[in-house]
């Protein structure tokens, strides 16, 4: 089905034309829940990897570094690309990256392969987050704070549950049990296809009705925007700096 045909099919559909689309927000929230649940499993299994392979704390830190670089630093690049070239089904593609990374991590037998595995999982997160945030805004119907809060609740819930599941599944049964989390990635990838279809329909509706893309706010100077962005980046950096230290090493202290 091409864009024009899809645009004809959805003509007059209120869930596409406007208004808050709670079904899409809920799906995005669930997808964020599953994505962040899987992401939080990686640091939770560090004790297993250290015991099995005899890694030093420096090597554990490098695993975290590679994971964070691929899952965080790449996000602006994927977001920039998505702004210029929207890809409605990229959310499912991101989950497929996560799926591949999980399966690799479950069978990884060397340090290099573990680094590759966590990098692939991180890339999946980098692909998911910018587009998922965009979809949440598109489905908000102007209620952007509500939409973002639903999106964030899903992610925070997943981050909280992931370590508990890792303790219940991976710690008793070993590294191979990581593959069980692949079921969550598969479910999320299939579920997010629904979002991709809605996203395609939304783009088709905008094209059919010649709805212009949102324009940047010109009432605020570019210099002020950059300063505000810099402050936000520094605040978030400081938060995740100590968060990464806690998630990487505090588990060993508890043990």
Where are these regions (language model features)?
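Extracytoplasmic
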Residues: 27-47, 55-57, 78, 246-251
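Flexible cytoplasmic inter-helical loops of multi-pass small-molecule transporters
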Residues: 181, 194-220
């Amino acid at each position: 089905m091409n864009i024009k045909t899809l645009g004809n099919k959805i003509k007059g559909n209120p869930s596409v034309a406007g208004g808050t689309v709670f079904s899409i927000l809920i799906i995005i929230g669930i997808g964020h829940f599953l994505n962040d649940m899987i992401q939080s499993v990686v640091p939770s299994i560090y004790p297993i990897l250290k015991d099995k392979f005899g890694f030093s704390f420096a090597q554990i830190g490098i695993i975290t570094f590679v994971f964070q670089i691929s899952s965080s630093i790449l996000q602006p690049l994927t977001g920039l690309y998505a702004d210029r070239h929207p890809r409605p089904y990229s959310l499912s593609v991101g989950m497929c990256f996560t799926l591949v990374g999980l399966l690799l991590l479950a069978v990884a037998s060397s340090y290099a392969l573990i680094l590759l595995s966590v990098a692939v999982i991180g890339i999946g997160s980098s692909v998911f987050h910018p587009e998922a945030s965009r979809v949440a805004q598109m489905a908000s119907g102007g209620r952007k704070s509500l939409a973002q809060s639903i999106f964030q609740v899903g992610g925070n819930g997943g981050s909280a549950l992931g370590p508990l599941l890792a303790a219940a599944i991976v710690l008793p049964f070993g590294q191979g049990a990581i593959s069980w989390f692949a079921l969550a990635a598969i479910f999320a990838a299939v579920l997010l296809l629904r979002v991709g279809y809605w996203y395609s329909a939304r783009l088709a509706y905008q094209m059919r009705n010649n709805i212009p893309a949102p324009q940047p706010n010109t009432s605020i100077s570019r210099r002020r925007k950059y300063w505000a962005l810099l402050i936000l980046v520094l605040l978030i950096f400081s938060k995740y700096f100590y968060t990464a230290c806690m998630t990487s090493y505090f588990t060993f202290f508890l043990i």
